[in-house]
A protein has these predicted regions:
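Substrate/ligand-engaging "lid" and interaction regions
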Residues: 2-8, 14-380
Length: 380
C-alpha cells in the first residue's frame, strides 16, 4: 500500500486511536490525529500508543507510532487539507464547531479539483444532511454547486467498540468481533481497511443498531449504576440488570421488526454475534454518560418504548430502564448534572416532556416511568 493515502482523525480518544488509528495504520495509510484536549495531544506526541485487540480467536497487543498529531486550537487547515479521508469522531453536539474548518478544507479541495471523503462516526442518527449543510454554509454559490462532485459525507455504524481509562490514555482495548459499517464510498478506496465493511443500507441499519444494541447496553449501564457496580462486565452478570436489559432487548427486537417490516436476517447484519476470547473490561460510566442524549425521543430507549406503547406490547422494561436513566448521577457529567437539576426543580413529568419529548399522548408510558422511578428511589 502506497503512503499517499492520508486520513485525518478528528477526535483522538478511545475510538480514534483504538479502532480508526490502529486499522488505518495497519493498512499503510498516513494517519494524523486532531484533538482539542491538550492532554490527549501531549500524550500522543510523546511517542506511541498500544491497542489490545480482542478477537473471537485470540487476544494480542500491538504498538503504534509514526503518526501526526495536531491541536485543533491552532490553524490546522493546511495539514488537514492534505487528507483525502477525514473521520469525525467527536460527540454529536460538538460537530458543529468543525464546520468552519471543514468548510476551508472543502474550499481547497474544490479549487484543486481533488476528491474528499468525510466519514461520520457517531451513534446519533440523521446527522449527515445537517453536517453537509453546515459545511456548505462556508462556501460560495459556485462551490456549493460543485460540492457533490468532489466531496462526499458518509455515515457510519459503530460496532467495533473500544475502551480505555480515559480519552488521553495510550493503552486501549478494542473489541474486534464484528465489523463497523460505512456508507459505500465513491471517491476513495478503503477496501483494505480491516474492521470496516461498506453498505448502501446504512441509514436503516444504523437506526436498528441504535435501538437493538445500544438500547439494551444502556439498560445494563443505568441498572448497573443503580446497583453500585462499576463495570459493564459486572452488570451483565447481575440478575437485576439482566432482567431489565434482556427485557428491553426482547421487546425492542419485536417492535423494531414490526415497525420497519424487517426480517430477522436484517438484524443479524448489525448484531454482535461473536464473543471475544477474552472480554474487554468496560466501565458503566462510559456507556451511561450523556443521559440527555440517550434519553431523547428518537434515541435508544424512549423510541422503542413509544413503539411498544403504540403496538400494544409490554413497555415495562423500557419504562424501568428510562427511570433508571433518570436516577443516574455523575458529578463529572454535565448532562447528568443538568438532568438532575431540572428533575429537582420541575419533577419527572416535565423532565420527560423537555428531554424525552413525551406528552399527553404517551400518558400511560409516563405514568409507568414515574411509578418505577419512585419505587426505585425508595429502595435505593
Amino acid at each position: 500500500m502506497s503512503r499517499k493515502n492520508r486520513i485525518a482523525i478528528l477526535g483522538a480518544g478511545r475510538l480514534g486511536k483504538g479502532f480508526l488509528g490502529a486499522e488505518f495504520l495497519n493498512a499503510g495509510w498516513n494517519v494524523d490525529f486532531y484533538d482539542i484536549d491538550k492532554k490527549v495531544i501531549d500524550n500522543l506526541r510523546n511517542g506511541e500508543f498500544s491497542v489490545e485487540m480482542h478477537t473471537p480467536y485470540q487476544t494480542y497487543k500491538k504498538k503504534y507510532s509514526g503518526y501526526g498529531v495536531y491541536d485543533v486550537n491552532d490553524d490546522i487547515s493546511k495539514p488537514l487539507r492534505e487528507a483525502n479521508v477525514i473521520a469525525i469522531d467527536t460527540y454529536p453536539q460538538d460537530i458543529y464547531m468543525l464546520y468552519p474548518l471543514l468548510g476551508k478544507v472543502a474550499k481547497h479541495k474544490l479549487a484543486q479539483k481533488k476528491r474528499l471523503s468525510i466519514l461520520v462516526f457517531t451513534n446519533k442518527t440523521n446527522l449527515i444532511l445537517s453536517i453537509t449543510e453546515g459545511i456548505k454554509n462556508y462556501l460560495n454559490e459556485f462551490e456549493n454547486k460543485e460540492f457533490d462532485t468532489y466531496v462526499e459525507v458518509k455515515d457510519a455504524i459503530i460496532i467495533r467498540s473500544t475502551f480505555a481509562q480515559s480519552n488521553s490514555a495510550l493503552e486501549v482495548q478494542s473489541l474486534a468481533v464484528t465489523d463497523s459499517i460505512i456508507e459505500k464510498l465513491a471517491y476513495n478506496d478503503i477496501s483494505n481497511i480491516s474492521g470496516i465493511c461498506e453498505s448502501d443500507d446504512v441509514h436503516r441499519l444504523k437506526s436498528m443498531k441504535l435501538f437493538t444494541i445500544n438500547g439494551p447496553h444502556a439498560a445494563y449501564a443505568y441498572s448497573g449504576f443503580y446497583c453500585g457496580l462499576e463495570t459493564m462486565n459486572e452488570a451483565e452478570l447481575n440478575p437485576f440488570c439482566q432482567e431489565v436489559a434482556l427485557g428491553v432487548a426482547k421487546i425492542t427486537k419485536r417492535v423494531i421488526l414490526n415497525e420497519y417490516k424487517l426480517k430477522k436476517a436484517d438484524l443479524n447484519r448489525i448484531s454482535i454475534s461473536n464473543l471475544a476470547k477474552d472480554p474487554i473490561l468496560d466501565s458503566i460510566k462510559r456507556v451511561a454518560c450523556n443521559p440527555i442524549r440517550k434519553l431523547a425521543y428518537n434515541d435508544r430507549l424512549v423510541y422503542p418504548a413509544v413503539l411498544a406503547l403504540r403496538q400494544g406490547e409490554n413497555y415495562d422494561f423500557h419504562a424501568k430502564a428510562i427511570a433508571l436513566g433518570l436516577l443516574y448521577v455523575d458529578e463529572t457529567d454535565e448532562e447528568a448534572l443538568e438532568l438532575q437539576d431540572y428533575l429537582k426543580n420541575n419533577g419527572i413529568r416535565e423532565t420527560l416532556k423537555r428531554y424525552s419529548q413525551l406528552n399527553e399522548t404517551h400518558d400511560m408510558l409516563i405514568r409507568k416511568i414515574i411509578y418505577f422511578y419512585e419505587e426505585l428511589k425508595k429502595r435505593r
